[in-house]
Amino acid sequence: MVRVYAPASIANIGVGFDTLGMAIAPINGSLLGDCISIEHANAFSLRSTGFFHSQLPIQLEENIVFQCWRKFCEILGQTYFLSIKLEKNIPVASGLGSSACSIVAVLVAMNYHCGCPLNTDQLLMLMGEMEGKISGSIHFDNVSPCFLGGMRLILQNCNIVNQVIPSFDDWLWIVAYPGIKISTAVSRSVLPNKYDREDCINHSQYLSGFVHACHTKQEYLAIRCMKDIIAEPYRSRLFPIELSCIRHNIMKRGAISCGISGSGPTVFVLCNNHDVIGDISDWLSRFYLQNNSGFIRICSLDNLGARIMVNN
């Protein structure tokens, strides 16, 4: 049996719409991501467990794990009969790279089980293609960090899919999932088709400034550049509380930045002072979480990405 874990991720990181993404890991050592277990069988089967498995499609053909299995077999020209178990630990349509977790975990597991017929680049391109079946367009800002770990700059149109961006060791990321769904399709539908020239210039300056600051270890500049003028002004209205209200309350409690994780509704809060984390988490728990499905996790950067947990 092969068991693979794929971590949750924060896409966009505020300033990098469809361009930045990072894998995250809870600092308490728990796992925040999906697990896939596969073993040889006489016929294909797929079963799902985990806290959020009830959110998955009922029809097998609509399950992204099944679609990944079918596509993998198609590429290799051979049908592999496997028993697959999905542990669905990331809520669907949460902004934490839920579909990427499942896609990355199953493709890494299948590739390893079958003797690694696909190399890293081939796997990554396949992951992006399968992600496109969920979101409607091929993109890598979740699958790339989920697969390879770290913070990633996506250069999709340059034939160099991603590059590693260094981060800051003392940064901690509070992620707050309110317990409601916002699909990527709905979240994208509220964005304008065109942006003002001034917004485009400002966005370019913030993004390039952030990447430069990370490489040159200028923390103050990186924080100043974490501004989202592409998505936040339009998506914030979909959330239980507008991000401006969240920002006001968490900044006065010691946070250094906050933003939308992916398409939302999860928000991230960035801190470099560990003493303020408890107060900020308490506020988010009281005012942002909407039901018992919501949760808050204190995370750091996950530099490992997808990994094999069991191989026997």
Curated annotation (Swiss-Prot):
The organism of origin for this protein: Blochmanniella pennsylvanica (strain BPEN)
Metabolic or biological pathway, per its Swiss-Prot or TrEMBL entry: Amino-acid biosynthesis; L-threonine biosynthesis; L-threonine from L-aspartate: step 4/5
Sequence positions that bind ATP: P91, V92, A93, S94, G95, L96, G97, S98, S99, A100, C101
Keyword presence, Transferase: yes
EC number(s) given by UniProt: 2.7.1.39
Reactions performed catalytically: L-homoserine + ATP = O-phospho-L-homoserine + ADP + H(+)
GO biological process: threonine biosynthetic process
Xref: Pfam families: GHMP_kinases_C (PF08544), GHMP_kinases_N (PF00288)
Record localization: Cytoplasm
Superkingdom to which the source organism belongs: Bacteria
Full protein name: Homoserine kinase
PROSITE patterns attached to this UniProt entry: GHMP_KINASES_ATP (PS00627)
CC per GO annotation: cytoplasm
Family classification: Belongs to the GHMP kinase family. Homoserine kinase subfamily.
Molecular function GO terms recorded: ATP binding; homoserine kinase activity
